[in-house]
């Protein structure tokens, strides 16, 4: 029985720069060859004009209405970081950042490329702060670094996810004060804990040895922690029950691992797949192809296209696409006998450096999929494809139909 290999370029879609996009420019003979044999189209991750987060977009792409199932990013980050959440826990996505003396954000990612040993050092400091503050407020606080500047912070106790972010989401703005979004003791307490952690880390970070070393190296100091997306674990029907599909995900980023795990996918990682722009894809693709004999759908997440987009790095984005395509090439014969999907979860134009709301290109190849006249996978060409314009939430039912796994609606 055939299966599906689904490659997703996070933030891969773009706007033209000089009338060309990274997908258009990239030398990707394997993906383009399969495009010439399959059906292409455009996909609205959620709906036209909506700027998706990676969390809500992946929920939709996995076949779950984000307006029904989304309860905040933090819980998915925690799940993907192997943090066991209990009922009532509130989890936040965090960024290690750089601010000036007035608390104005200079860089929301502290230069982005934070070494693992630096991240571990900061993790120890924040957990020590959390222990002290937790005792004061009668809660437990736990922080875990994930990849580069990213991390997750969990508060356990009489708390609420109904508090505002401290992350202003832009450079040049001051760190925000968390405020309760409902009139409850739990929300008020949670906001107090968040604000105290924020202030304490800013104070202590001035004397951290890693920051002294970073300054000597000409790097930005890690002197702030930004919190956003406070949430709790939603109750989600497993994908095997909802779509009769056995699914696996390969990802190096905690958020995507968490969303996949939340919907009941088996989650894997691979050597070289760390969720950065420098990822090496050979082992990840090899694993994906091997897993196709065990699962109906194997999902492979590529983070580097989003990271380079946020950095405004056009050529870097092209390089990520080309490296993934090169890793696919040895398995072309295998792909020709199965189904193959390529798309993005959202556009992150290098000219904007943020998520935007336009549709993204999608390719569906299979031995029995209609062949249209699109021969190159890009935002500029897939409009002509036979798939037309679909939504993210349509993808899983379409795959289930081709695999013969979905039930008929009606008689």
Swiss-Prot record:
<dbReference type="Pfam" id="PF10143">
    <property type="entry name" value="PhosphMutase"/>
</dbReference>
<dbReference type="InterPro" id="IPR004456">
    <property type="entry name" value="Pglycerate_mutase_ApgM"/>
</dbReference>
<dbReference type="GO" id="GO:0006096">
    <property type="term" value="P:glycolytic process"/>
</dbReference>
<dbReference type="InterPro" id="IPR042253">
    <property type="entry name" value="Pglycerate_mutase_ApgM_sf"/>
</dbReference>
<dbReference type="GO" id="GO:0046872">
    <property type="term" value="F:metal ion binding"/>
</dbReference>
<keyword id="KW-0413">Isomerase</keyword>
<protein>
    <recommendedName>
        <fullName>2,3-bisphosphoglycerate-independent phosphoglycerate mutase</fullName>
        <ecNumber>5.4.2.12</ecNumber>
    </recommendedName>
</protein>
<comment type="pathway">
    <text>Carbohydrate degradation; glycolysis; pyruvate from D-glyceraldehyde 3-phosphate: step 3/5.</text>
</comment>
<comment type="function">
    <text>Catalyzes the interconversion of 2-phosphoglycerate and 3-phosphoglycerate.</text>
</comment>
<dbReference type="InterPro" id="IPR017850">
    <property type="entry name" value="Alkaline_phosphatase_core_sf"/>
</dbReference>
<dbReference type="GO" id="GO:0004619">
    <property type="term" value="F:phosphoglycerate mutase activity"/>
</dbReference>
<dbReference type="InterPro" id="IPR006124">
    <property type="entry name" value="Metalloenzyme"/>
</dbReference>
<keyword id="KW-0324">Glycolysis</keyword>
<dbReference type="InterPro" id="IPR023665">
    <property type="entry name" value="ApgAM_prokaryotes"/>
</dbReference>
<comment type="similarity">
    <text>Belongs to the BPG-independent phosphoglycerate mutase family. A-PGAM subfamily.</text>
</comment>
<dbReference type="Pfam" id="PF01676">
    <property type="entry name" value="Metalloenzyme"/>
</dbReference>
């Amino acid at each position: 029985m055939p299966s599906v290999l689904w490659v997703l370029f996070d933030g891969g879609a773009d706007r033209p720069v000089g009338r060309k996009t990274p997908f258009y420019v990239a030398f990707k003979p394997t993906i383009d060859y399969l495009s010439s044999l399959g059906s292409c189209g455009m996909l609205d991750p959620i709906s036209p004009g909506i700027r998706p987060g990676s969390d809500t977009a992946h929920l939709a792409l996995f076949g779950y209405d984000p307006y029904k199932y989304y309860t905040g990013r933090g819980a998915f980050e925690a799940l993907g970081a192997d943090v066991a959440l209990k009922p009532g826990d509130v989890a936040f996505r965090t960024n290690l950042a750089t601010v000036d003396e007035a608390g104005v954000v200079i860089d929301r990612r502290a230069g982005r490329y934070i070494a693992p040993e630096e991240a571990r050092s900061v993790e120890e400091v924040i957990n020590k702060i959390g222990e002290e503050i937790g005792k004061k407020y009668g809660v437990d606080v736990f922080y875990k670094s994930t990849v580069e500047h990213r991390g997750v912070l969990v508060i356990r106790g009489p708390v609420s996810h109904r508090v505002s972010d401290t992350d202003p989401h832009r450079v040049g703005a001051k760190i925000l004060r968390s405020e309760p979004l409902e009139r409850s003791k739990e929300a008020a307490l949670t906001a107090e804990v968040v604000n105290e952690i924020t202030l304490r880390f800013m104070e202590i970070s001035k004397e951290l040895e890693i920051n002294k070393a970073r300054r000597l190296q000409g790097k930005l100091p890690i002197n702030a922690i930004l919190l956003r997306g406070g949430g709790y674990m939603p109750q989600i029907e497993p994908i095997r029950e909802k779509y009769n599909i056995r699914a696996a995900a390969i990802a190096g980023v905690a958020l995507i691992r968490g969303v996949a795990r939340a919907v009941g996918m088996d989650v894997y990682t691979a050597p070289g797949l760390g969720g950065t722009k420098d990822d090496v894809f050979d082992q990840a693709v090899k694993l994906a192809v091997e897993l196709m004999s065990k699962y109906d759908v194997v999902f492979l997440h590529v983070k580097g296209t989003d990271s380079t987009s946020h950095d405004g790095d056009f050529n870097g984005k092209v390089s990520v696409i080309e490296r993934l395509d090169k890793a696919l090439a040895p398995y072309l014969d295998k792909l020709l006998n199965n189904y193959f999907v390529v798309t993005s979860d959202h556009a992150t134009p290098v000219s904007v450096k943020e998520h935007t709301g336009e549709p993204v290109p999608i390719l569906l190849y299979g031995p029995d999929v209609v062949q249209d006249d699109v021969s190159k996978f890009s935002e500029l060409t897939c409009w002509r494809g036979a798939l037309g314009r679909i939504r993210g939430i349509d993808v899983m039912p379409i795959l289930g139909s081709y695999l013969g796994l979905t039930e008929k609606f009606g008689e």
